[in-house]
């Protein structure tokens, strides 16, 4: 593609809202190619949908649906609490029970040993009631924070719903966190209670527990005969609790969820979400994931990540469908067996997992009967065009990428089932979401750019229900996210003439080289077109003449070994695909690239290690570089 290599026509300065340093934002000129031309140059044609591909889709005519959509109509799809108010857990389970759908399978949990535990909407509601009673009996009240440190265990889902029924605030954490990240998040959140395993507690919490005076109760799963002092055996407490509980009356703007997101530096930010968010969770499930009543849905996201809450718990349950939970870690054969045996119809996963499946090959996927799959979607980081197209080869349909953030609470931009897919694009905004591309002005404001394929910061008009309401106890940090009536996402993007959005990179990831603004995603995608490359991470490193030059880190597919000949071949491949101005000047081989639990390649960590800089917050690091 030539998009990022276009000549720069204008340079402005703005303040980085997180680091408070001056950075340059370069806006692209009219010399950019159109999206279609760029895709054809890469050999990736637009994937045209046939009418039979989206028969019965909830959204069939995007323009008409967007024209008539209102959040008021979306709210009317939910019941609300008897007597007034709104509660996420009530909408997720209780209203289905009251409507006579209690016998429907809500959650199927598959253990590492292939054991199965099924929860209907009625039994899930009763279990959540028991946990709500456990909290209430111990003085945990409305607004108190309840943290969880669990993997994909039934207690996590029961705990989340029971916490919300009690009017308390659910705050999940990655089970892979070490003691310090856990302590930091629970301290910021002023947590009153914690749900975790006995093993996690002994290793990760007990050594510092006395320092967090707000922590009143610790509920342990997988308890031994001799649990640690000042802890509660959750199973025993649940067995003694009533399965009747009247949901605490919460209002739409009452705090419901506290999700932490890490910046490049500094302490974690606690993004506050309210019960009103359920309006967005519900409707985006219908529109972006095309939920229908008989769907079987599998979201593979870690429950410590917001996707694991918004779309791993709330959205499928409010839509009354069946969701699959797998306790085990990734294994290609196991995943395909689950898709086949559980007859999954909608599958929501991450680019990292898709690339790992690609390593196993399309022929491996074809050994399984995956004919029930209707929609495959991806989130976590931009999905490389090659992965989108590989979906057609392996499954007969493309992966549908979408974009959102912890701060937005739900899907904002997506490739809809009934719309053509442009490989590499994020898709189009959800009805009710006003997105734009802006340039930053000298006076601190922003100006919207309407020219197709002009690069700028992706922004959103505030007002959707799942928008974060605050960074907990950090009002100034929160206010910096909003300028001139827009929410600033911190992502650079482009919008084509058809209204599709294209991710370029985080504003602090973009490489400025010899007058060119280079998006790392574009370079990574080009490298991944090569048959030897499994994944790639790209950074800019200082160079006296150009300012920065591109360096790539590459992990190879099975069957390929690092060599100088292969390094030169990849450099030549990239120059041919991207041109000399954008292609990497150096390539380093790695067995693995550092990634977060949500599957994002940690480019800033690659850069810090390359340049000997401080690594900053690495609490979300899952896979280490090697």
What are these language model-derived features?
Residues 103-105, 220, 225-226, 231, ...:
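Conserved pre-ATP/AMP-binding loop-to-beta segment of ANL
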Residues 436-461, 494-498, 561-567, 602:
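Conserved beta-loop-beta connector loops within the AMP-binding
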Residues 279-299, 303-346, 359-361:
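Conserved AMP-binding/adenylation subdomain of ANL enzymes
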Residues 235-238, 344-349, 358-421, 434:
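Gly/Ser/Thr-rich phosphate-binding loop
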């Amino acid at each position: 593609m030539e998009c990022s290599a276009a000549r720069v026509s204008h340079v402005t300065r703005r303040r980085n809202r997180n680091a408070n340093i001056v950075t340059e934002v370069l806006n692209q000129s009219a010399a950019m190619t159109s999206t279609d031309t760029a895709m054809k140059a890469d050999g990736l044609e637009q994937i045209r949908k046939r009418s039979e591909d989206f028969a019965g889709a909830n959204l069939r005519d995007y323009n008409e649906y967007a024209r008539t959509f209102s959040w008021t109509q979306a709210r009317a799809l939910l019941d609300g609490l008897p007597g007034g108010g709104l509660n996420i857990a009530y909408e997720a389970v209780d209203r289905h029970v009251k409507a006579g759908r209690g016998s429907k399978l809500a959650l199927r949990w598959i253990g590492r040993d292939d054991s199965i535990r099924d929860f209907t909407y009625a039994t899930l509601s009763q279990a959540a009631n028991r946990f709500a009673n456990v909290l209430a009996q111990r003085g945990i009240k409305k607004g108190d924070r309840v943290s969880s440190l669990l993997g994909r265990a039934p207690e996590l889902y029961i705990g989340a719903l029971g916490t919300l029924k009690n009017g308390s605030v659910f705050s999940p954490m990655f089970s892979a966190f070490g003691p310090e990240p856990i302590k930091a998040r629970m301290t910021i959140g002023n947590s009153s209670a914690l749900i975790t395993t006995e093993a996690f507690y002994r290793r990760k919490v007990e050594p510092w527990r006395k320092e967090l005076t707000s922590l009143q109760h610790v509920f342990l799963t997988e308890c031994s005969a001799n649990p640690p002092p000042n802890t509660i055996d959750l199973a025993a407490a649940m067995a003694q609790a009533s399965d009747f509980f009247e949901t605490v009356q919460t209002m739409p703007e009452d705090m419901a969820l506290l999700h932490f997101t890490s910046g490049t530096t500094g302490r974690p930010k606690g993004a506050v979400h309210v019960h009103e968010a359920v309006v967005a969770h519900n409707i985006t499930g219908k529109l972006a994931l095309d939920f229908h009543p008989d769907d079987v849905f599998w979201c593979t996201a870690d429950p410590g990540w917001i996707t694991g809450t918004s779309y791993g718990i709330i959205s499928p349950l409010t839509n009354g469908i069946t969701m699959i939970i797998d306790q085990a870690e990734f294994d290609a054969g196991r995943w395909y067996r689950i898709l086949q045996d559980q007859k999954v119809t909608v599958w929501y996963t991450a680019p990292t997992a898709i690339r790992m499946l690609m390593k196993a090959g399309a022929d491996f996927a074809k050994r399984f009967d995956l004919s029930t799959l209707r929609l495959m979607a991806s989130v976590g980081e931009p999905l490389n065009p090659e992965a989108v197209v590989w979906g057609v080869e392996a499954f007969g349909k493309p992966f549908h990428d979408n974009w959102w953030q912890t701060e937005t609470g739900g899907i904002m931009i997506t490739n809809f089932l009934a719309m053509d897919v442009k490989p590499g694009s994020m898709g189009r905004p959800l009805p009710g979401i006003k997105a734009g591309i802006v340039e930053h002005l000298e006076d601190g404001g922003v100006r919207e750019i309407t020219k197709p394929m002009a690069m700028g910061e992706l922004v959103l008009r505030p007002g959707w229900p799942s928008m974060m309401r605050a960074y907990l106890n950090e009002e100034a940090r929160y206010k910096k996210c909003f300028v001139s009536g827009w929410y600033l996402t911190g992502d650079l993007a482009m919008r084509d003439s058809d209204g599709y959005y294209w991710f370029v990179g985080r504003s602090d990831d973009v490489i400025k080289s010899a007058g060119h603004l280079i998006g790392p995603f574009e370079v990574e995608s080009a490298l991944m077109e090569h048959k030897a490359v499994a994944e790639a991470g790209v950074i800019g490193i200082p160079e006296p003449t150009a300012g920065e030059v591109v360096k790539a880190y590459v992990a190879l597919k099975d069957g390929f070994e690092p060599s100088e000949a292969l390094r030169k071949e990849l450099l030549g491949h990239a120059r041919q695909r991207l041109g000399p101005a954008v292609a990497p000047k150096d390539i380093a081989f790695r067995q693995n690239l550092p990634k977060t639990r949500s599957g994002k390649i940690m480019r800033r960590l690659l850069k810090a290690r390359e340049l000997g800089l401080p690594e900053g917050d690495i609490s979300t690091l899952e896979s280490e570089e090697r």
